Each structure stands twice: as structure tokens, then as C-alpha cells.
UniProtKB/Swiss-Prot annotation:
Any one Gene Ontology cellular component term annotated for this protein: nucleus
The protein's name in its UniProt record: Protein pelota
GO biological process: compound eye morphogenesis; female germ-line stem cell asymmetric division; germ-line stem cell population maintenance; male germ-line stem cell population maintenance; meiotic cell cycle; meiotic nuclear membrane disassembly; meiotic spindle organization; nonfunctional rRNA decay
Upper lineage: Eukaryota, Metazoa, Ecdysozoa, Arthropoda, Hexapoda
UniProt function note: Component of the Pelota-HBS1L complex, a complex that recognizes stalled ribosomes and triggers the No-Go Decay (NGD) pathway. In the Pelota-HBS1L complex, pelo recognizes ribosomes stalled at the 3' end of an mRNA and engages stalled ribosomes by destabilizing mRNA in the mRNA channel. Following ribosome-binding, the Pelota-HBS1L complex promotes recruitment of pix, which drives the disassembly of stalled ribosomes, followed by degradation of damaged mRNAs as part of the NGD pathway.
Cofactor field: a divalent metal cation
Keyword Ligase appears in the UniProt entry: no
Similarity comment: Belongs to the eukaryotic release factor 1 family. Pelota subfamily.
Disruption phenotype: During spermatogenesis results in blockage of cell division preventing spermatocytes to enter meiosis and lack of spermatic individualization resulting in sterility. In germlines, increases transposable elements transcription at both mRNA and protein levels.
Pfam families (UniProt xref): eRF1_1, eRF1_2, eRF1_3
Region (Disordered) location: 371-395
Keywords: Cell cycle, Cell division, Cytoplasm, Meiosis, Metal-binding, Mitosis, Nucleus, Translation regulation
Compositionally skewed regions (Acidic residues) per UniProt: 372-384
Tissue occurrence: Expressed in ovaries and muscles (at protein level). Expressed throughout all development stages.
Amino acid sequence: MKLLGKYVDKGMQGNVTLVPEESEDMWHAYNLIAKGDSVRSTTIRKVQNETATGSSTSSRVRTTLTIAVESIDFDTQACVLRLKGRNIEENQYVKMGAYHTLDLELNRKFELRKPEWDTIALERIEMACDPTQSADVAAVVMQEGLAHVCLITASMTLVRSKIEVSIPRKRKGSVQQHEKGLAKFYEQVMQSILRHVNFDVVKCVLIASPGFVRDQFYDYMFQQAVKMDYKLLLDNKSKFMLVHASSGFKHSLREILQDPAVLAKMSDTKAAGEVKALEQFYMMLQCEPAKAFYGKKHVLQAAESQAIETLLISDNLFRCQDVSLRKEYVNLVESIRDAGGEVKIFSSMHISGEQLAQLTGIAALLRFPMPELEDSDDDDDEDGAAGGVADSDSD
């Protein structure tokens, strides 16, 4: 998504101008636009013209309209977002208050104004417009003395760092100089990974090289991680994958990304963290049910006690038409983050999001047991107590 303009003041009033550039951007737009927002974009309108003789003709004209959104329809096949509402700005072709349907398409600019912006909507814009926010995969292509640290998104590859170090040749009597040069090179590559790879977003890090360079670097990196207590690397060791590449130049990425093993690893990167969180929830539900709850009522009660370690919430809940209910969910997310908890926002378009929807779209893993929540009466059908009817479809 391309951000052309953003004017949101401290009172959370204002507008943004965006251009969707790929299909995923239309999904972001669908999550951003809500009933009651105003959207301005170019459109085609059928206009009736009366001639001097009294007869009428119709023609199609391109114009720019601003509508107050009343309904939203997302056609995933055609990748078109249809917004229906009343015209709210003077226009030579369309009367004030007349209904019109705006079709938002790829590469068509639109301006979005909300009665009040919130943190979830602003985060969605940041994620959609910052390519590093959506880069699920990082890759280091390397050979002795040369490395490229890259981030890979659905549409582009970004070279975040190029490392070049002159390494003395391995000659008789000068092996030590060669090893010193290699250590210097490996250290710079490791520091570049720590600096440029956001492990909260990146789900897979490919280390690729000809020969044994990748293996030697991998061993060096995790020896140093243990020695220097680099928890970021140690906690994410499972995300690293060693693969063959013909060189340390960027063009070697093509062959790497065609490797069936790499493709299999990458196919699940988009929501790997969410899948893992959901698996942990189901496991906790079976082993320690007093530390796993789903349903709005129980989750809110746990949040009041600052007991939530991880919140699992569907993006579908932020699309609700009830403004006060949306605010309640936004406040919940903010309060959990303020208390040091983690929030996983699931896409309802992913299989893990569909599973979460079966648990009312909201669930939580707790820091400590709250058996009193299990005992609390729940007359609301939308809420479920931990240890109840949840069923894992992990196959």
C-alpha cells in the first residue's frame, strides 16, 4: 500500500490518502473502512442530459465523489471493494444526498476520513504501508567475504545490508589471519541480522551459501549468542534454515526461493506465529484450563485482573458496526499491551483465524490460574468457559 498523505491530529481527527497496489492491500482497506466513515475517490456516474428538443440522452462521466459509507462489500475474486453511501459534497453530476456505489480497485487512489481514528486502524495503515512490517521472510545470501541481508515480502525483495570484508587467503603459516578475517566477517553479518530482522514479524530466516560457509557462520552465530547471551537469536533459533546458493550475490535468491524445501517452509510463514499461539491455547485448555479462556465475558474479566499474557483476537471483531463495541475491543488491546501482555490479531481469511472464530473470535492465555472464572455463571451464548466445548482441528 502506498501512503500519499496522512493528516491525523492529537485528537485522532483527520484523514489519510492511500493507493492499494496489490491484492493484500484491498484486504487492509476492507479492514480499515467502517460504516460512518467518509471516502473520496474517482468514479464513473451515468448522467441524464436533456436536449433542446426535450429528448434525453445518457452518458457516462468520470467524476470525484465523497460518500458517507453505509455498506461495504469485498469481492475477493475480482479484488474490488464496493462502498455504498450518500454523496456528502457538492458535485455537478450528483446531487447532495444521492446514493452512489464507489468501486475501490488496485492502483486507484482514495481518501479516508473517520469520525475518530484509533490505534488499531493506525497500526493497520503502518503495517500495510511499511514493507518491512509485512516481510515474513529474511534471507542472508553469502560467500566468503560477501553477504547480502534481505527482507522478502509478497511483492518485493529489500536489501537491508551489504557486507564486504577482505579475508586473507589461507596460506601456509598464515591460517590465523584467515580465521581472524572470517570471524570479523561473521560478526558483521550477525550484527546486521540483529539490526535489520524484526523477529516479531519475520517467521523464517534463510542462510544460503555455496560450500560450507552457511554452516560455519551458523555455528559461529549461535556460539556467540550463547557466549554473549543474545536472547533474540537463542529464542528464535528454530526460524533459521540453511540452504544452498551458488553465490553471495542477490541474484542467488531466485534459485533459493525455487527450492521445494524453502517453498514448503515459507508457505506457512504468514500466520505461523498465530498458528503456534492457537496450538498453545488448545494445549493449555486441556492441561491447565484455569489459564485459558475464550469468549468476551471471561477475557474482559481476566483483563481487569491484568492476568492476560497473550490475547488472541480476530480482525473480524474490529469490523463490527457497533462503534462502542469496536472501542471496547480497541481499549482491551491497549490495556493488555500497557500491562506487558502480547496481542495476536488473527486474519479471518486464514485457517487459524477461522479456528479462532469458532471460539467466538477472542481468547486469552493467562499468566496465572483464575479458577473463579470457570465457576462464574455464563448465560450469554457467545461466551464459553475454558475446558468447555472447544475442539482442536489440528490435523
